[in-house]
UniProtKB/Swiss-Prot annotation:
UniProt protein name: UPF0102 protein DSY2577
Organism this protein belongs to: Desulfitobacterium hafniense (strain Y51)
Organism lineage: Bacteria, Bacillati, Bacillota, Clostridia, Eubacteriales
Gene3D superfamilies to which the protein is assigned, alphabetical: 3.40.1350.10
Any one GO molecular-function label of the UniProt entry: nucleic acid binding
InterPro entries: Restrct_endonuc-II-like (IPR011335), tRNA_endonuc-like_dom_sf (IPR011856), UPF0102_YraN-like (IPR003509)
Superkingdom, natural source: Bacteria
Residues annotated as transmembrane: none
């Protein structure tokens, strides 16, 4: 992955964290890694644990972030969430939700990125 894409991804994740904190969620972890992959953000809203995938794009030439979650990716996110709950010693299975935050950073001077939060993907 190019340095530009990595920097864009980090920027998007930072924006997403600010956005979900402003919405009143508690961020539990960022960039949770396990043998099955990585979860961008894990947060809590009340009693619900939310696993959040962040997709940041600067152009729609390959599709926007909200168009990029496949069934295979969704399944991998579920497996990572199961790993997280098991290895964080949750005694009971909490209420879960999987969200997507898509960030569009179009190159228009002075324009704030568009943040699209899709709950329950």
């Amino acid at each position: 992955m190019s340095e530009h894409r990595q920097a864009l991804g980090r920027y998007g994740e930072e924006l997403a964290v600010k956005h979900i904190r402003q919405a009143g969620l508690t961020v539990l972890e960022c960039n949770y890694r396990c043998p099955l992959g990585e979860m961008d953000i894990i947060a809590r809203e009340g009693e619900t644990i939310i696993f959040i995938e962040v997709r940041t794009r600067s152009t729609g030439s390959r599709g926007w972030g909200e168009e990029s979650i496949t069934a295979k990716k969704r399944e991998r996110l579920y497996r990572i969430a199961t790993h997280y709950l098991k290895y964080r010693n949750y005694k009971e299975w909490p209420s879960l939700r999987f969200d997507l935050i898509a960030i569009r950073c179009q190159d228009q001077e002075g324009k704030q990125p568009d943040i699209i939060w899709i709950r329950g993907i």
